[in-house]
Amino acid sequence: MIDFDTDSDQIKAKAEEQMVIVAGFMKEYPETTALVAGHTDDVGSPAYNMKLSQRRADCVMNTLITKFGIAKSRLSAKGYGDTRRLEYNTSAEGRKKNRRVEVWVDCVLVKN
């Protein structure tokens, strides 16, 4: 999970480690695909948050492509706005946990 500041689509430096893990797994298992899912807190209008969440997802997806060499055909990005919260948005801590991108990797591991 990659967290974001309020009203920002900029990836924080501390997210590098998480991106390395995702990219490493996808390189080790080249048949995998991933959904990059962007989310927001409930500050702002639903329409604005939908666009912000999409920008966050696009930013993470583009970083996986350009910095880590993951093929674009293996990735898709979707913004969910504030529709899939992890916590209630009634506190600063709750809102912080909802400002995130999740990368869901789909794969089938075959035992030899």
Feature-to-residue mapping (PLM):
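Sec/Tat-exported extracytoplasmic proteins
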Residues: 23-26, 30, 67-68
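Acidic/histidine-rich, surface-exposed loop or edge segments in extracytoplasmic proteins
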Residues: 1-5
